[in-house]
Amino acid sequence: MSWDQVWIDVNVATMDTNIQGAYGVIPQAAIAVKDGKIAWVGPRSELPEFDVLATPVYRGKGGWITPGLIDAHTHLVFAGNRANEFEQRLQGATYAEIARAGGGIISTVNACRDADEAELFELGRQRLNALAREGVTTVEIKSGYGLNTETELKLLRVARELGEHHHIDVSTTFLGAHAIPPEYKDNADAYIDLVVNDMLPAVIAENLADAVDVFCENIAFNLEQTERVLTAAKQAGLQIKLHAEQLTNMGGSALAAKLGAKSVDHIEFLDEAGIKAISESGTCATLLPGAFYFLRETQLPPIDLLRQYKVPMVIASDFNPGSSPICSTLLMLNMACTLFRLTPEEALQGVTINAAKALGIDNNVGSITVGKQADFCLWDITTPAQLAYAYGVNLCKTVVKNGQVVALPN
């Protein structure tokens, strides 16, 4: 056999659902890579003969290999921070009081409108580097901090550029309907007109988005407004997803299911009818424990019902300056287990195969399966559960992206 590289002396958590047992484990395994793809994976004892002298062989010293991690929900491109608001909230100020004083999401919008692309790119690069050190190989990045055509396009251009210049793959999402900007505060319908008739065509013309998202909530956009945006996006051939049921149960998830959305995200207030709907549509449920933790929420997402209806559960950081300023996918594994009561296996599924499903790329990444992209990580652990168990020491030893061993940034 002719391969570009071979990995031996490893245990592999394939996360391939076709392999029986927890994590899709293959103990004492080997992996072969050819042309950036997984060419062979299985027990070391069954590895076909190959030219050892002509093939780089990597020894894992008994460590574990998992698929490269995927963070399927971030707002990673932004300027400024809201540490002052964090302090104000701890001193008793309400979100409404902060917003009336010019804070909240609008403060980030103003910072992003003022920032140039070079500044936003450098900030985004630093954040991608932080995720890369944790074994992340694919990241979704949303816009949504522009709320006008010029700045929304700027944010998406930066996200695309980050994907072109970093080893991490970047999936971009247009979230123009993230909040109602001050200039439209009394006319949300008119702002949705702008999103549908001006922003979305401009985004499509520059091929800046892989998907479109809307914040469907009583403090943002109603069902009718949400459907307008998602329908227009779907008609344009873009994938759709939804922020839904974070603060109230508005029925956004049922709408998402009707329209064939890839995921509904947050979903603390999702009810059984909504769960049944997304189960039937194949829509993923994206859990965001970082926001739950940072906002000190108390309404837990309906984990048992999601299990009952076999809805794929995704775990993501929701990294953003307001409700989850936590740039760590690994920490989300621990939070998903400790706060939401997921098992370590469910948590790891949530940042591998299920995250890939939420982004519509599970045919190419998310598990260590022959034919898929060779994106994987070598960890200095004794069991995959260790990734969710402990936090603070980086156990990621090596990352392979598209079949190439990458140098992790300092």
UniProtKB/Swiss-Prot annotation:
Protein name, as recorded: Imidazolonepropionase
A Pfam family of this chain: Amidohydro_1
GN (gene name): hutI
EC number: 3.5.2.7
Binding site for Fe(3+): H73, H75, H243, D318
InterPro entries: Amidohydro-rel, HutI, Metal-dep_hydrolase_composite, Metal_Hydrolase
Pathway it works in: Amino-acid degradation; L-histidine degradation into L-glutamate; N-formimidoyl-L-glutamate from L-histidine: step 3/3
CDD domains tied to this protein: Imidazolone-5PH
Gene Ontology molecular functions: imidazolonepropionase activity; iron ion binding; zinc ion binding
Function description: Catalyzes the hydrolytic cleavage of the carbon-nitrogen bond in imidazolone-5-propanoate to yield N-formimidoyl-L-glutamate. It is the third step in the universal histidine degradation pathway.
Cofactor mode of binding and number, as noted: Binds 1 zinc or iron ion per subunit.
Keyword Cell cycle part of the UniProt annotation: no
Residues annotated as binding N-formimidoyl-L-glutamate: Y145, N320, G322
BP GO terms, sorted: L-histidine catabolic process to glutamate and formamide; L-histidine catabolic process to glutamate and formate
Cell compartment(s), UniProt: Cytoplasm
GO CC list: cytoplasm
Catalyzed chemical reaction(s): 4-imidazolone-5-propanoate + H2O = N-formimidoyl-L-glutamate
Keywords noted in UniProt: Cytoplasm, Histidine metabolism, Hydrolase, Iron, Metal-binding, Zinc
Needed cofactors: Zn(2+); Fe(3+)
Family: Belongs to the metallo-dependent hydrolases superfamily. HutI family.
